[in-house]
A protein has these predicted regions:
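Short, flexible, glycine/charge-rich loop motifs used to bind or transfer phosphoryl groups or to couple energy/partner
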Residues: 101, 123, 250-253
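Functionally critical loop-and-helix segments that line ligand-binding/catalytic clefts
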Residues: 47-110, 255-313
């Protein structure tokens, strides 16, 4: 009987080594490509971060981002008109007013605060959907020529900024002439000491019977507001005028103040003034976690105003 031929073990070994070698080469190639892919992902992430580098102090997750210093200025030819369609007002998930159009939010939510609001928990305020805060720098006394710094100015500035809330400022004026208004503006500038702001420094004049500035004429009040705002503007900040709907309409020549712009106070379900204002203070009875008692609530409409998407036609 013929014996079976024994297999050639040497040939099997050579083939096995060849196959293992090919597998190793493929595996090494795959691993060498992985760092390159990771590097590309990191590069893409960096590009995305770079694209967002222009965004300043943060807005809430549903609000319009802040990419530059906010200006309230309007064209003097448009100042006596309403550029908004108030049907676009909606309550957002924080129960704050928002201006919505075509599925986009064209507004920001804000507060204005002073020592009268006490100590503020700014982290809690941020978590209430607040994007910006107007902080009082000081005030002139109603019955005397005395200027007083707000006792919690520095605390409010630091707290808001630490929690990524955009900041502006305001001064409560009782100036009776342009020189006093310039002095008030210089006081504000000295207290801020070059502090970087996202929002304007606002001239707040609220005349009441018996106040030292109550009897001023429209021309005098306009000149006083211009003196304050131009001094602020000359120092590199934006400026604006705050007043109630009736006072803005009756106490100022608005076309002369249009280059600064307006912050309107009117406590109603929608503004009634035919004025191209930028910010609307819609209540002085707001409630927020982080602030004891009532607080003024505001909606910044500059994204709608400047984009031309607030058109009510």
């Amino acid at each position: 009987v013929q014996r079976p031929v024994r297999p050639n073990n040497t040939l099997f070994i050579v083939v096995a080594i060849f196959i293992v070698g090919i597998a190793l080469i493929i595996n090494i190639g795959a691993h060498s490509a992985q760092p390159e892919a990771q590097e590309q992902v990191q590069s893409d992430d960096q590009d995305e971060m770079t694209d967002m580098s222009g965004v300043k102090q943060g807005a809430g997750d549903n609000s319009f981002p802040i990419t530059d210093d906010v200006s309230f200025a309007v064209d003097s030819r448009d100042v006596y008109s309403n550029p908004y369609d108030w049907r676009n007002l909606e309550w957002n998930k924080y129960n704050n007013l928002a201006y919505e159009k075509d599925g986009k939010t064209l507004s920001r939510e804000g507060i204005d605060v002073s020592q009268h609001n006490g100590e503020i928990d700014w982290n809690a305020v941020k978590n209430e959907g607040i994007d910006f805060a107007m902080v009082r720098v000081g005030a002139r006394a109603k019955d005397a020529d005395v200027i007083i710094e707000d006792s919690v100015l520095e605390q409010n500035l630091e707290g808001a900024k630490r929690n990524n809330i955009a900041v502006g400022a305001y001064f409560y004026s009782q100036a009776t002439n342009a020189d006093e208004a310039r002095n008030e503006a210089e006081f504000v500038l000295s207290k801020l000491s070059g502090e970087e702001l996202d929002y304007p420094i606002v001239f707040d004049f609220e005349p009441e019977k018996g106040d030292r500035a109550y009897t001023l004429s429209t021309e005098q009040r306009t000149d006083i507001a211009k003196a304050f705002c131009s001094t602020i503007k000359g120092a590199g900040y934006n400026s604006a005028i705050y007043s109630s709907s009736s006072d803005l309409t009756c106490l100022y020549n608005l076309d002369e103040l249009a280059p600064y712009g307006f912050w309107l106070a009117e406590y109603n379900y929608k503004p009634t003034a035919d004025i191209a204002f930028a910010v609307w203070q819609y209540t002085n009875q707001g409630t927020l976690k982080g602030i004891d008692g009532a607080v003024d609530l505001n909606i910044d409409l500059t994204p709608a105003l400047q984009a031309g998407k607030g058109d009510n036609s």
